[in-house]
C-alpha cells in the first residue's frame, strides 16, 4: 500500500535519528523486567505447590514476560525477598523511564513535526490523499504515547483511522 509505505519512510527517518537512545533505554528496561520475572518463575518452580497451581502461576508470569511488564504486586504468600525484588525492579524501571522521558518526548515531537512538514510538502504537489493521511497520523499520534512507542519498537502500526 503506497500510503503505508510513505508513512513507513517517515517512521524510518525517526527511528534512524532517535533509535539508538530508544534501543538503549528498551534494553535496560526490558533487562530489569526480564531479570525479575525469570527469578520469580524459577522460584515458583521450586515451591512445594500442586502442579496445576504452579503451571497457572508460571503461565501468568510468562504472559508478563511476553508483554515486558512487571506485575502490580505479589500475593501475601510470596516470600519477602521476591516482594523486595519487585519493589526494586519497579523503582529501577521508573527511574529509567524518567531518565529517558525527555528523549522520548523529543523523538515524538520530531515525528509529529516531520509529519506536518511532509504533509504540507505533498499537499503543495497535489497529493491530497497522502497529505490528509500524514495530518491524520499526526492527530492520532499526538496524545498517544503507546502508538509512538510501538512505532519506535518497529511494530507494524497500521494507517491512522478517523476517530
Residue ranges and their predicted role:
Residues 1-163:
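Low-complexity, Gly/Pro
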